[in-house]
Amino acid sequence: VLSNHILETHHVYVKESLPIISEFANKVAKVHGASNPENIEIAKLFHEVTMELQQHLMKEEGILFPHIINLAIAHRNNETISVPFGSVQNPIRMMEHEHDIAGDVFKKIEKLSNNFTPPAHACNTYKALYHHLKEFQDDLHIHIHLENNILFPKAIELEKE
C-alpha cells in the first residue's frame, strides 16, 4: 500500500514537476544569469538532478517496487520467492545512496537561492522558480523519508521472515 502511495503521489509529482521547473530554471538563468549568476548554477544543478531522478524512478518502478510488492504477497501467502539481485538490501542501498545525492544537490540549490528567497527585483518567473524549487524539495524530503525510514526497512524485514 505504501509503495502505491509513493508511486501515485510522489513519483507522479516528480515526473510532472521536473519539466516545469526545468523550463523556469532555464528561462531565469538565460534572462537573469548575467546579473544573478547563481541562477546559471541552479539551472545546471537542477538539470543534473533531473537526469538522476528520472533514472532513479525507472529503477524503483521497474525493479525495486515490484519486488517489494512480490515480497509482501509471498509473505502474506507463506511463500518464498527468488531474488534476482541477491538481497533486497542491494538495490535499497543503491536507492538510499541516490537519495543522498539528490538531497545534497538540493542543499546546494537552497544555498545558492538564499533559502529559495528571490531578490526584490525578481519577475514572476523568477519567483515561480524559487517557489517550485522549495515545494519540490519539501516533497522530496517526504518521499525520501517514506522510502528510507518506512518502506525499505519493512522490505528488509519481509525478506528476512
Report the location of each language-model feature.
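Small-residue-biased structural context
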Residues: V1-E161
